Regions:
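Elongated, amphipathic alpha-helical interaction scaffolds
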Residues: 1-326
Length: 326
């Protein structure tokens, strides 16, 4: 038995956003949003998943949307690649879901709360060790809640969840393990299969249950992720290697020249020692920075300033200057 990776937008919506996924989504949301308490007893999946009918279909699997029994809206997004402006996009989507509820003539009191659940395959908040965090509107000094707590942002950072199968406790941890490890498993683990909704999720993710068109879409999604990660990794490695090589060469040359000049003025012994040391250090630094700029210039037409900064080691401001000079 093989399972598809549930972290692609296609697979995530098929598993959690199909017409037959109501019980799965209720279990998932109760586990992540309400400490496994049965707060959600019913919901309506908005714009449910539809199987692809033609090749070359567009990327329509943005997120899963649901309306709870009390009218609240939940939007769930699975994000694999870290892109520039993602934090603002989360806020924009939540605000849009909240602000577009009313028709002309309707009252603001009819607005329903919105919860944006964002699951990432990268670390968003390195300052916090916990995998899950939640944000709401609060008073700046006293940290009291805004009277209408209608907007809530919940984040789950999968890389921070590192438990193994035998360490799992509770439904929430089993759902996170499912998201991380499903494609590595060959059978449904007994302790996870005991939960009907997780067992059903595994069955939907079973490769044997997918149509050829769905398998093709999933393969394209995975290939895109691999390609993007490969581009970033290769550029990062090449930038470091070239920067080190040029830094060494320039450092040696400048170190010899400065060492001779200072040695004549201050004494051959001290001049050579200090000149070589300072020259090598300054040469390496200048050489690496120049090489980093060269790498950044090559990537200007392919990536955002934030991505280029992460790969080259430059600051976002330095990348912006290079883009302006281009």
């Amino acid at each position: 038995m093989r399972f598809i990776n549930p972290k692609t937008d296609f697979a995530f919506k098929k598993i959690f956003g199909s017409d037959q996924s109501k019980a799965i989504l209720i279990s998932f949301l109760n586990a992540l949003l309400y400490q496994e308490r049965p707060v959600i007893v019913d919901l309506e999946i908005i714009d449910p998943y539809l199987a692809p009918k033609i090749q070359g279909m567009k990327d329509t699997f943005v997120d899963v949307r649901a309306r709870l029994q009390d009218g609240r809206k939940v939007i769930i997004e699975m994000q694999v690649l870290n892109v520039e402006g993602f934090e603002k996009r989360v806020l924009y989507n939540a605000a849009k879901a909240y602000s577009t509820q009313l028709m002309v003539g309707e009252s603001y009191k009819d607005l329903s709360a919105v919860v944006a659940l964002t699951i990432t395959d990268f670390v968003m908040f390195p300052e916090w060790p916990e995998a899950q965090s939640a944000y709401m509107l609060k008073e700046k000094e006293r940290l009291t809640d805004y009277p209408e707590g209608d907007l809530e942002l919940v984040f789950v950072e999968l890389p921070k969840f590192r438990k193994e199968l035998e360490e799992l406790v509770g439904v929430k941890e089993k759902w996170l393990y499912f998201l991380q490890k499903a494609p590595d498993l060959e059978v449904i683990p007994e302790t996870m299969g005991e939960i009907a909704e997780i067992r059903a999720a595994f069955q939907i993710a079973n490769v044997a249950s997918l149509s050829p068109e769905e398998l093709e879409v999933q393969e394209r999604k995975m290939m895109y992720i691999y390609d993007q990660r490969g581009v970033q990794s290769k550029a990062r490695a090449e930038g470091r290697a070239e920067g080190r090589a040029e830094g060494r060469a320039e450092g040696r040359a400048e170190g010899r020249a400065e060492g001779r000049a200072e040695g004549r003025a201050e004494g051959r012994a001290e001049g050579r020692a200090e000149g070589r040391a300072e020259g090598r250090a300054e040469g390496r630094a200048e050489g690496q920075e120049e090489k980093a700029k060269e790498v950044a210039r090559r990537l200007l037409g392919q990536m955002t300033d934030q991505q280029i900064a992460e790969i080259s080691g430059l600051t976002v401001a330095q990348v912006a200057v290079l883009r302006a000079e281009k």
